[in-house]
């Protein structure tokens, strides 16, 4: 026995073989006639016992033309990267700076936070993270909200 599944409608074997001409789920007149995907569920011989196995759906694959591939590439614009810069200050303790960096920047480890804090302390500033402009501005505002001096600048890719 087989059960036909079309979209979200499952037709039991009884409706396939004992259907009336006016039945709206009749396979010859039903909603499956114009569908491109029709799956069959092979069930065991005894109805109501055991599960079934789904056969692989038949899907028509169309490969996009050369023009559409270029259109997809054009539509996917990658946001230019921006740097979040931490500036050295004389009023926040080093431990506090490490805690804020770990709290504000997702995935920031203790070792990375300590290295960034040390670089800012020694050199006057340090790159905290390079990300999209919206994320960089959000991180900068969160750092400032916690009392740290920070800024955002485009990532030029230089030293």
Swiss-Prot record:
The protein's location, in the record's own words, is: Plastid, Chloroplast stroma
Pfam families associated with the record: ClpS
- Where is the transit peptide, renumbered to this chain? 1-44
InterPro entries membership: ClpS, ClpS_core, Ribosomal_bL12_C/ClpS-like
Please provide the record's keywords in A-Z order.
Answer: Chloroplast, Hydrolase, Plastid, Protease, Transit peptide
Q: What is the effect of changing residue 90 to A?
A: Loss of interactions with some potential substrates
For this UniProt entry, the molecular function terms from Gene Ontology, in alphabetical order, are: peptidase activity; protein-macromolecule adaptor activity
Subunit field text: Interacts with CLPC1 (via N-terminus) and CLPC2, but not with CLPt1 or CLPT2. Binds to ClpF; this interaction stimulates their association with ClpC.
Question: What does the UniProt record say this protein does?
Answer: Small adapter protein that modulate the activity of CLPC. Involved in plastid biogenesis in particular when chloroplast protein synthesis capacity is a limiting factor. Probably involved in substrate selection for plastid Clp protease system. Recruitment to ClpC chaperones is facilitated by CLPF thus forming a binary adapter for selective substrate recognition and delivery to plastid Clp protease system (CLPC).
Q: What is this protein called?
A: ATP-dependent Clp protease adapter protein CLPS1, chloroplastic
